[in-house]
Amino acid sequence: MLPRIKIQFLNGQLGTVGESPDGLFALVCGAAAVTKKLELGKAYTLHSFDELDALGVTSENNPRLHKHVQDFYTEAEEGTKLVIFPVDKAKTFTELCDKDTGVIKELITAENGALRGIFVAGDGREATITTNGLDNDLFTALPKAQQLAEWATTSLYAPLFVILEGRGYKDGAVKDLHKEAYNRVGVLIGDTVKASEGAAVGLMAGRLATLPVQRNIARVKNGALKPVAMFIGEKPVEENASAVSDLYDAGYITPRKYVGKAGYFFTDDCLACEQTDDYAHITARRTVDKAYRIAYAALLELMMDELSVNEDGTLQHGIIMAWQQMMENAVNRAMTATGELSADADGTGCKAYVDPTQNVLSTSKIELTLKVRPFGYARYVDVKLGFQVETGK
């Protein structure tokens, strides 16, 4: 080879942030196969409602799958990605969510950890065994879904949450989800169809896909949901306010109405865990999960790197400062700068800390603490109202 000069363009020097698929969700739904077009247990990526035609899915052969996708794209713009995963109608939620034998695990693996949330729906059949106010399968699926999401987090470094369709609601008392410990799983009750055996999970997924990670699906400024009618069981939402309140108190997500506002809104974004859990809401879950992914990507570049140490085996000060700054910069660029974290006066929304006393030379292990600052939310507003009058006259 002749002597030469070769100049390469460097990339990644400006600190810009690439697209993050925070709203990439999967819809797992009981369905019927369509010959040569739709296979069960196979993932399909959609970008519009019309793409269902190519898969042979109609309101006649797959009414619930068709409805959920249609609902999704009434909230999300055409072009928004949605992964659909049709499954055997006979499979229970408990079977689907099993981290060892369930097919949703195969979906998560096949999508290479890209999914941020999974919405699980049945095919609309009547619930056969109902306890605690809902299909019993729902409650046995809750721990399975939690274990599945935890597996994705620890094994694939791909944290996600799961929303289960609250099947079989007939009014009356329900199990209190605030007494559970499933901070990666939520339950939706309520549909656009009267006396539905399922819930409008497509609608919820579509709304959530349009929002940044810190934004609550119940935020009034988001605007009303697109459907002109929504139901809790057999009653319209506006005629079932007591059920909406009771379900909210028990930790379920439902649609609601506000006096003076047209349309429907979600009540909140509760997950099936104690209200004191740091991750009791989808907003907290999505926020910290995004920080998790950013931290993993940043730290991966430092794996097996050489580290300068002091005589006692502890890290040199410069190394500690570099690691802390690297972590904070990565999160602040990707999240604080885009308004997804609550920034302090210096414009930072996170803090990284490396313990300077740890002996890295003997353990080859570095323990780092990363804390991100979330937003507060106006859930309860109390106003003291009275007359303003002048006294002494």
What are these language model-derived features?
Residues 61, 133-140, 279, 283, ...:
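Catalytic cores of large soluble enzymes that bind and process phosphate-bearing ligands
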